[in-house]
C-alpha cells in the first residue's frame, strides 16, 4: 500500500493537547521500512547485474545493452575516472545528449566514488559557466560533437570526451572502490532567489530507499519497461533511471524529437510497449488514453494535476500523483487514484516509506487536520544541503523538533492534512513557482532582467493561460523602448527556455504599496495591448489561414497576424508541440524545432510539409454500394426491418438548450454523410442512397415533463414510439427527443443500425460535446476534419474484394468450412417462434477489482488480448454446460481493419461491423494453459480479424469467388463492446438511467421490433460499465428455461475468474508462435522447441 497510515490518522485526529500531537505524529509518520541502508546506488545496480546479466537494461532507438554489457562499459569508464583523480565526493559535470552513453557516464562516476552534476546541453552559455564555476567540478564529461559548447567557457578542470575506442580497452570487472551510502551521489542545480541557480547535494541512501519503494509500493519488476522522459537536469531523470536499473527492468530513452510530437510519442509508447512512465501533467493533458495501450502505471509529478485529468486516465491505468522537492530525493508523498469521485483538487497523498511529513506554523508548531501550514519533510531522503551555501542550508534544513538529532526540510509549500490521511497542496508561501514541472524562483528571473543596461525596475509574476497552464510575465520600467525580440534574446543568454517570460510588458512606473514595495496585485493582466505587437497582417493562403486558426486556439487569442511572434503572444515549448499536433489533423507536418527558429507565420510557412493526402471534405451524395454487413441485414428479410435501431439517452442536470441542440445536430448530420442515407427498392434490389442537404435530415421533438409525476414512463413510451417511426425508404434515419424534467433534461437519440455502430457512437458523442460547448460560447461550430467517406470505403472495398492479394485468404476460409461441423446446442423446448418479443436476458458481472485484473494484469501471462480470455472462458462454459468439445460460434468485430492502403476511416460514421465463424476447440479442457494459448493462436490465424469472410460472400465477383460453401450456421453470437460507458461521460452530459424502448444498444438487450426475428439462439454481449465487466445472455423463453441459461452464466463466470486468477499468478510471460510470426508453426511444435531449449540449458 502507498498509504499505510491513513486509518491511524483518522483515529488520532480528534485527540487533544500534547497527547494528541504525539498520537498525530505517530499516525502520519509511521512509515518505517527496511531498505539496504548500507549500500550505494552502484552496489545495488551490480546486484541486478549478477541476478539477470542478460536482461535488457537500456534501450535508445535501435541500440540496446544488457545489464552485463552496461556494467562492463561503466566499469571501463570508471577506471579512466579513477586514473584522473576522481574519488569520494569529487564532482564531475556531465554534459551529454540523451543516449546510452549518458547513462554509462553517470554509472561510471558513481562507481569511481564521485558525484555527478548534470548540465543540460540546451542551457545558455552563461548558465553552463556558472554551474561549472560554482560546483568547482574537477572534470567535465561530454561528447565529441558537443565540444563546441565549451569553447567559449572558462573551465579549469579536465574535459573528458566519451570515446568508445578509448573506453573499451580497459578492464570491465567491478571496481570495489570503498564507498558508503552517505557519500555524495549527485548535485542538481535548481532556480535560486539570488539570481543564480543553487546546487542541492543528494546522497546514495535516498535512492537506496527508493529502490524498495519502487519494488514494494509501485510494484515495478524486471518485466517492466520504464520510459525515460525527463531532461538530465531534472531530478525526475534520476527517478526514471534507477526505477529501472535497481529493479531489473528496462529503461527506454525517449528522444526530444519524439517528445516534441504527441503523435510520435503515443506511437513510441505503443511500439516499445512501455509499461511505466512519469510525466508532468502539462504534457499528459495532450495525450489520449484510448491511443496508448501498453501503459499500466502513469505517474504525474512536477506540478499540480487536475481532477479532470485523473478522471480521463484512472480507468485505463494505475494513476499515481507524486510530490517531492529535489531536496528530499525526488519523491516524498504519493496518492493513488481510486474509483471514488475526486473533489475540487487532487491530493498529493501521504508520505512514502521512511519519510515524515509535518505541517507547521511559523514557529514549527503542528497544525491541526484541515488547517493550512508549511509542509516540512524529514527522513532518509533528505539532502545533505546546498553546495557552498551554509546560510541557506541552515535556513531550509533546520533541527527537527519532533525527532531529536535529525533535520527537517522547510519546503516553502503550503498544505493541509485532509481527514482521510492525505495531504492537499495549497500553493507556495514565497515567490517560487512551477513552470512545466521546473522550479522557478521569480527573483532569479528578475535579477537577470535587471542586468539589462536600460532596465531600471522589474517584477515577474505567474499567470495561467486559457488552458489553465502557468506562464511567466515580466514587467519592466525603462526610459527607452526596448524591442521585444531583444529582451527575449537577452533573457535566453542566461536563462533556460522554461524560465524565459512569455510576456514582457513595459510600464511607465511600478505600482507601489504604502510601504514603497512593488504592489504585485496591481500589475496589469498580460494583454496584447500592453505588448509590443507589430501591425496586423492577414494570412495570404490556405496554410497561413490554418496556422492562424491553430495559433488562435492554442494561445487563446482572437486575432493573430502572420507577422506576430509566437513567443511574444505567450507561446512556449509545450504550446509549440500542441501546434504541431493540431497540424496533423490537417495532414500537415511541422517540426517543433522550426517553430523555435521561425516564430512568425510568414517565416514558418516555408517549413510546413504535407504529411499525406486529405480526405474529401465536401458533401457526399448519390448511390452507394452495400457493404457486407448491410448485405447480410437485407438477406435476413426481417419482418420489420425499419425498426432495427441503436439508441442512446443522455442526461444533463443543468438542462439542454433546444436552439443550440438544433444547430449542433444540423452540423453533425451535415458533417457525417452516412446519417443522411435512405434505402429504395429498384428492380428487385436494395439501393443505398446518400442524400444531400435537402429535405428533413433528422426529426426533433421536445417534451415538457416538469409538471409530470410519471416522467420515467412517459419517456419510455415516447422513446418506443420514436423507435418504431423510422422508415428506411423515406427517412430520416435519425430521431431526437428532448425531455425536460424537474431534475434536468434527458436527450434521446435513435439511429437505424444500417448507418451507425459502436465506434460511430463514440465519434458522435465527442462531436456532440465539442459542438455544444462551441455553440454555448457563441463560437462557430467546427468539427474535426472528415476522414474518408462511407461511400469511398464501399467503392474501395469492392475493388479489394477482387484483388489478387485478398483472394489469397480463400485457403483459410475454405479449410474452415470443409473441416468444421455445425453443432447444435441443447435446448429445453422446440419452437419455430423466434420473435424478439420472446427474448429474455440473464446477466453476470465481475467486481471492480476483478475487472481491473482482467483489463490490466491478465494479458501479460500469455501476451493475450481480452477476446482471447473471454472466448476461452466461453469454451470452458459451453463444455461444462452442453458437453461440447468443439463448436463454431459467430464473432463480431468492429470491421475497421486497415486493409485498404491510404484509406482512413478513423472518424467515419457508418455500420462497419464484421462477423465471421470462429471455432472453440476444447478437446484438451483439462489443461487451462494450453486452452488459453490455443484460443490465442486460433484467433491470430484468422486473416485480417475475419473481415474477409463476408467480403467473399457478398462482394467478390462470382467468377473469381473460390468454391466456398458458406454452410456454417453458428447458433451462438459473441460480441465484446469494450469500455463504452466512459465514452458517454463528459463534462456536459452522462448516460441517462431511463429506458429507451426497444433498441439494439450496447447493453446487450437486442429487443428491436417485438415482431422482428431473433437471428441467433444465444446472443452473448460483453461490455464495461462503471468499472465492471458485464456479460449478458439473451435467449428465447420458448426455447429455454431461465434456470438453464443461469447455469451457463454461472459456469461462464466461474471459468472466467479461474482464468483471471491463473494468469495473475503466473510470474513469467509465455510466448506462442504468433509472437514470433511463425505462421506455420503449431502450438505443440513450439512447446517441444521450448522443452528442448530448457533441457539444453540445464
UniProtKB/Swiss-Prot annotation:
EC number: 5.1.1.11
Gene: grsA
PANTHER family documented for this protein: ENZYME, PUTATIVE (JCVI)-RELATED, PTHR45398
Residue ranges of every copy of the Carrier domain listed in the record: 538-612
NCBIfam families found in the cross-reference section: AA-adenyl-dom, NRPS-para261
Cofactor dependency: pantetheine 4'-phosphate
Protein name, as recorded: Gramicidin S synthase 1
Cofactor binding remark: Binds 1 phosphopantetheine covalently.
Protein task: In the first step of peptide synthesis this enzyme activates phenylalanine and racemizes it to the D-isomer.
Main enzyme class: isomerase
Entry coiled-coil feature ranges: none
One example GO MF annotation: ligase activity
Family membership noted in the UniProt record: Belongs to the ATP-dependent AMP-binding enzyme family.
Lineage: Bacteria, Bacillati, Bacillota, Bacilli, Bacillales
UniProt comment concerning the protein's domains: One-module-bearing peptide synthase with a C-terminal epimerization domain. Each module incorporates one amino acid into the peptide product and can be further subdivided into domains responsible for substrate adenylation, thiolation, condensation (not for the initiation module), and epimerization (optional), and N methylation (optional).
O-(pantetheine 4'-phosphoryl)serine found at: 573
Gene Ontology annotations of biological process type: antibiotic biosynthetic process; lipid biosynthetic process
Organism this protein belongs to: Aneurinibacillus migulanus
Additional remarks: The racemization reaction takes place in the thioester-bound stage of phenylalanine that is formed via the thiol group of the serine-bound phosphopantetheine.
InterPro entries (alphabetical): AA_adenyl_dom, ACP-like_sf, AMP-bd_C, AMP-bd_C_sf, AMP-binding_CS, AMP-dep_synth/lig_dom, CAT-like_dom_sf, Condensatn
Key word Transmembrane present: no
Domain of life: Bacteria
Swiss-Prot/TrEMBL keywords: Antibiotic biosynthesis, ATP-binding, Isomerase, Ligase, Multifunctional enzyme, Nucleotide-binding, Phosphopantetheine, Phosphoprotein
Pathway: Antibiotic biosynthesis; gramicidin S biosynthesis
Record's subunit section: Large multienzyme complex of GrsA and GrsB.
UniProt entry tagged with the keyword Isomerase: yes
Chemical reaction(s) catalysed: L-phenylalanine + ATP + H2O = D-phenylalanine + AMP + diphosphate + H(+)
Amino acid at each position: 500500500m502507498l498509504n499505510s497510515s491513513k486509518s491511524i490518522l483518522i483515529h488520532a485526529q480528534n485527540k487533544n493537547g500534547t497527547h494528541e500531537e504525539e498520537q498525530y505524529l505517530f499516525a502520519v509518520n509511521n512509515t518505517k521500512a527496511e531498505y539496504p541502508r548500507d549500500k550505494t546506488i552502484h552496489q545495488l545496480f551490480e546486484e541486478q547485474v549478477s541476478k539477470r546479466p542478460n536482461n535488457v537494461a537500456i534501450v535508445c532507438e535501435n541500440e540496446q545493452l544488457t545489464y552485463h554489457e552496461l556494467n562492463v562499459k561503466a566499469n571501463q569508464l570508471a577506471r579512466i575516472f579513477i586514473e584522473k583523480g576522481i574519488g569520494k565526493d569529487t564532482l564531475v559535470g556531465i554534459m551529454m545528449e540523451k543516449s546510452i552513453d549518458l547513462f554509462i557516464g553517470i554509472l561510471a562516476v558513481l562507481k569511481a566514488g564521485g558525484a555527478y552534476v548534470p548540465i543540460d546541453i540546451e542551457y545558455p552559455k552563461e548558465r553552463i559557466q556558472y554551474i561549472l564555476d560554482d560546483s568547482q567540478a574537477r572534470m567535465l564529461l561530454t561528447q565529441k560533437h558537443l565540444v563546441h559548447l565549451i569553447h567559449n567557457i572558462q573551465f579549469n578542470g579536465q574535459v573528458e570526451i566519451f570515446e568508445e575506442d578509448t573506453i573499451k580497452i580497459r578492464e570491465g570487472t567491478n571496481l570495489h572502490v570503498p564507498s558508503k551510502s552517505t557519500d555524495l551521489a549527485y548535485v542538481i542545480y535548481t532556480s535560486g532567489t539570488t539570481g543564480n541557480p543553487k546546487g542541492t547535494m543528494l546522497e546514495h541512501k535516498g535512492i537506496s530507499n527508493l529502490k524498495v519503494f519502487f519494488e514494494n509500493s509501485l510494484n515495478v519488476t524486471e518485466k517492466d519497461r520504464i520510459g525515460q522522459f525527463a531532461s538530465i537536469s531534472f531530478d525526475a531523470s534520476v527517478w526514471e533511471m534507477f526505477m529501472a536499473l535497481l529493479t531489473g527492468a528496462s529503461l527506454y530513452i525517449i528522444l526530444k524529437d519524439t517528445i516534441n510530437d504527441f503523435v510520435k510519442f503515443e506511437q513510441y509508447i505503443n511500439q516499445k510497449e512501455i509499461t511505466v512512465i512519469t510525466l508532468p501533467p502539462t504534457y499528459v493533458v495532450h495525450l489520449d488514453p484510448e491511443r496508448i495501450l501498453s501503459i499500466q502505471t502513469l505517474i504525474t509529478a512536477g506540478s499540480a494535476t487536475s481532477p479532470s485529468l485523473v478522471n480521463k486516465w484512472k480507468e485505463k491505468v494505475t494513476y499515481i500523483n507524486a510530490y517531492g522537492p529535489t531536496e528530499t530525493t525526488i519523491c516524498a508523498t504519493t496518492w493513488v487514484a481510486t474509483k471514488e469521485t475526486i473533489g475540487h483538487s487532487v491530493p498529493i497523498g501521504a508520505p512514502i516509506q521512511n519519510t515524515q511529513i509535518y505541517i507547521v506554523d511559523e514557529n514549527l508548531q503542528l497544525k491541526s487536520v484541515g488547517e493550512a501550514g508549511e509542509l516540512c519533510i524529514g527522513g532518509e531522503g533528505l539532502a545533505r544541503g546546498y553546495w557552498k551555501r551554509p546560510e541557506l542550508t541552515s535556513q531550509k534544513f533546520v533541527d527537527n523538533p519532533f525527532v531529536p538529532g535529525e533535520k527537517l526540510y522547510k519546503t516553502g509549500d503550503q498544505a493541509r492534512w485532509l481527514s482521510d490521511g492525505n495531504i492537499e497542496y495549497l500553493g507556495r508561501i514565497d515567490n517560487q513557482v512551477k513552470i512545466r514541472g521546473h522550479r522557478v524562483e521569480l527573483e532569479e528571473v528578475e535579477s537577470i532582467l535587471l542586468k539589462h543596461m536600460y532596465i531600471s525596475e522589474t517584477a515577474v509574476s505567474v499567470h495561467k493561460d486559457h488552458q489553465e497552464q502557468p506562464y511567466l510575465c515580466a514587467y519592466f520600467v525603462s526610459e527607452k523602448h526596448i524591442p521585444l525580440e531583444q529582451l527575449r534574446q537577452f533573457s535566453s543568454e542566461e536563462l533556460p527556455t522554461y524560465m524565459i517570460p512569455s510576456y514582457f510588458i513595459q510600464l511607465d512606473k511600478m505600482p507601489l504599496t504604502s510601504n514603497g514595495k512593488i504592489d504585485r496585485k496591481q500589475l496589469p493582466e498580460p494583454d496584447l495591448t500592453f505588448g509590443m505587437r507589430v501591425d496586423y497582417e492577414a494570412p495570404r493562403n490556405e496554410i497561413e489561414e490554418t496556422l492562424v486558426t491553430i495559433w488562435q486556439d492554442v494561445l487563446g487569442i482572437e486575432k493573430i497576424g502572420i507577422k506576430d511572434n509566437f513567443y511574444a503572444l505567450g507561446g512556449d515549448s509545450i504550446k509549440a508541440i500542441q501546434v504541431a499536433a493540431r497540424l496533423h489533423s490537417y495532414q500537415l507536418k511541422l517540426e517543433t524545432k522550426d517553430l523555435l527558429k521561425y516564430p512568425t507565420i510568414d517565416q514558418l510557412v516555408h517549413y510546413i510539409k504535407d504529411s499525406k493526402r486529405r480526405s474529401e471534405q465536401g458533401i457526399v451524395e448519390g448511390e452507394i454500394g452495400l457493404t457486407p454487413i448491410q448485405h447480410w441485414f437485407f438477406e435476413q428479410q426481417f419482418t420489420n426491418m425499419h425498426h432495427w435501431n441503436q439508441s442512446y439517452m443522455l442526461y444533463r442536470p443543468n438542462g439542454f438548450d433546444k436552439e443550440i441542440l438544433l444547430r449542433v445536430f444540423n452540423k453533425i448530420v451535415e458533417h457525417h454523410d452516412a446519417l443522411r442515407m435512405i434505402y429504395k427498392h429498384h428492380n428487385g434490389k436494395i439501393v443505398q442512397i446518400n442524400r444531400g442537404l435537402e429535405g428533413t435530415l433528422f426529426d426533433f421533438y421536445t417534451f415538457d415533463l416538469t409538471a409530470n409525476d410519471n416522467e420515467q414512463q412517459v419517456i419510455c413510451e415516447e422513446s418506443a414510439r420514436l423507435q418504431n417511426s423510422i422508415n428506411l425508404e423515406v427517412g430520416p434515419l435519425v430521431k431526437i427527443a428532448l425531455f425536460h424534467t424537474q431534475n434536468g433534461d434527458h436527450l434521446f437519440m435513435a439511429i437505424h443500425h444500417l448507418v451507425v455502430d459502436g465506434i460511430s457512437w463514440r465519434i458522435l458523442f465527442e462531436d456532440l460535446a465539442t459542438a455544444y460547448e462551441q455553440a454555448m460560447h457563441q463560437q462557430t461550430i467546427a468539427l474535426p476534419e472528415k476522414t474518408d467517406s462511407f461511400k469511398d470505403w464501399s467503392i474501395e472495398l469492392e475493388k479489394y474484394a477482387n484483388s489478387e492479394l485478398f483472394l489469397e485468404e480463400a485457403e483459410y476460409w475454405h479449410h474452415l468450412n470443409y473441416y468444421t461441423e455445425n453443432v447444435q446446442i441443447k435446448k429445453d423446448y422446440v419452437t419455430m417462434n423466434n420473435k424478439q418479443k420472446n427474448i429474455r436476458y440473464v446477466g453476470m458481472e465481475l467486481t471492480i477489482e476483478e475487472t481491473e485484473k482482467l483489463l490490466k494484469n491478465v494479458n501479460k501471462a500469455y501476451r493475450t488480448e481480452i477476446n482471447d480470455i473471454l472466448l476461452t472462458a466461453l469454451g470452458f462454459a459451453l463444455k461444462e454446460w452442453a458437453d461440447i468439445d468443439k463448436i463454431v460460434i459467430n464473432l463480431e468485430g468492429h470491421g475497421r481493419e486497415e486493409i485498404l492502403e491510404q484509406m482512413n476511416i478513423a472518424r467515419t460514421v457508418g455500420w462497419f461491423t464484421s462477423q465471421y465463424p470462429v471455432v472453440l476447440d476444447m478437446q484438451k479442457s483439462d489443461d487451462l494453459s494450453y486452452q488459453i494459448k490455443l484460443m490465442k493462436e486460433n484467433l491470430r490465424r484468422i486473416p485480417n480479424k475475419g473481415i474477409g469472410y463476408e467480403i467473399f460472400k457478398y462482394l467478390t465477383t462470382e467468377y473469381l469467388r473460390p468454391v466456398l460453401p458458406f454452410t456454417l450456421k453458428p447458433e451462438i453470437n459473441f460480441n465484446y463492446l469494450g469500455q463504452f460507458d466512459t465514452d458517454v461521460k463528459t463534462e456536459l452530459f452522462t448516460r441517462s438511467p431511463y429506458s429507451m424502448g426497444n433498441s439494439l444498444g450496447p447493453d446487450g438487450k437486442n429487443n428491436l421490433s417485438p415482431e422482428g426475428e431473433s437471428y441467433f439462439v444465444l446472443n452473448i454481449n460483453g461490455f464495461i460499465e462503471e468499472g465492471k465487466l458485464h456479460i449478458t445472455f439473451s435467449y428465447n423463453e420458448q426455447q429455454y428455461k431461465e434456470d438453464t441459461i443461469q447455469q451457463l452464466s454461472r459456469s461462464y463466470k466461474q471459468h472466467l475468474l479461474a482464468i483471471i486468477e491463473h494468469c495473475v499468478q503466473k510470474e513469467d510471460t509465455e510466448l506462442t508462435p504468433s509472437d514470433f510470426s511463425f505462421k506455420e508453426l503449431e502450438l505443440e511444435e513450439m512447446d517441444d522447441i521450448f522443452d528442448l531449449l530448457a533441457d539444453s540449458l540445464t
